[in-house]
Amino acid sequence: MPKEQLLMMFVSNPAGARARRRHRYAPLAAVLLLTAHPLPAAEPLAFPGAVGWAATTPGGRGGQILKVTNLDADGPGSLRAALTEEGPRIVVFEVGGVIDLDRKTIRLEQPFVTVAGQTAPSPGITLIRGGMDIAAHDVVMQHIRIRPGEAGAAKGSDWGEDAVSTASAYNVTVDHCTLTWATDENLSASGPRFTGDSPDEWRSGTSHSITFSHNIIAEGLGDSTHPKFEHSKGSLIHDNASRILIYGNLYAHNYERNPMFKGGVQGVIVNNFIYDPGQRALHYNLMALEWGDVPFQEGEMTAVGNVLRAGPSTELPLAFLMLGGHGDLLYYGRDNIAVDRIGEPLPMLGRYATGKARIIETDEPPVWWEGLEVLPANEVETWVLKNAGARPWDRDPQDIRVLADTAEGRGKIIDSEEEVGGYPQPEMTHRPFNPEDWYLETMMPKRPEVLDSRAAGRGT
């Protein structure tokens, strides 16, 4: 593929005008309405194509440029050191390769930061044997791969690691990243269930205004090192998290939580491709034992233009959205596709518990981010496979394998990274960072050749 096309994939929202034009004639009048009301021009986006309630976060805009100059787990010049600095900052990379965290989670606690993985020389940056907790506000992270894996821990031990989790964070966008081989969730939004005395205070006290866009969220490890053993999970959106947008992601080979909303969550799920879930794709569950005597809150979910396709690990029967627990869910679903391995339709709604919970279908979205452009569901599979994940212009072998298996209906849920080749071991590469090559306000490249690639034309 020419680099000019690769650059357009990177800097633009592929749904764009094409989605608006096609929805103008679509029979789904409700979907057409969802594409209206663009953001005011006065609010600059974090980067072109940014979406969701975190779309206008400044991240590290205007702050100091911090260069990652080595692949060490910590110390001067490391990624961890850059993330622990105070004040607005843009983290760029003068090295490419693997950072071995040695089971020491990175905890990002200082706000106003942009992590620009697109600046790294090929093959980009991959974190292994650990993950990242984002416990700050106004964070943009793009084009990073995180693969925790078993990290040498014993089966059923205490090694339950998310690739990325937000912890009471807000105004956070995780965009075009690859998150695989977690032993807990691959990508989650979390925090305390109840902070304060009212539902509004609960929501402000946990993660809110979070966007997960254009990521590969795949191969959560099953019978692995988590103390509960089976724990192949995609995304957990924890109780009372709100203003959550999950957009344009690939969920592949995760047993459950593709994604899962817990009690009282308010979020939007649009144009995602869910392939080969084990026993659940989307699900909602308010667990009465966790809420105790606290009044249950209705969850709110809007799901539009998503695709679910069963694979070799899928347990049938399976529904697109499954309900468990005891809390009710306000649900708006339109133009979603759910099929088995030979293209036969699967049910849209189901349940996996006998509690009193209800799915209350609504005529209008209970929650929506105005300005979101929606692609028709029958175009989503190709679009997601082309655009999701870190560095689409410079795929690494593991991403290529996941994408190819998804396209061809292959692959499975795995228990260890060793089943698919183990941790990557590329040689370290170097390239000086030149600020004149980048629009520093958005960390977009000024020219196609700025995006370093040794894989152009290799395809998937």
What feature does the model see in each segment?
Residues 57, 77-84, 101-110, 129-133, ...:
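Short, T/G/N/S-enriched strand-turn elements that build extracellular solenoid repeat scaffolds
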Residues 266, 277-397:
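Active-site/pore-lining binding-face segments in mid-to-C-terminal subdomains
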Residues 26-37:
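Bacterial N-terminal signal peptides
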Residues 100-245:
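Right-handed parallel beta-helix
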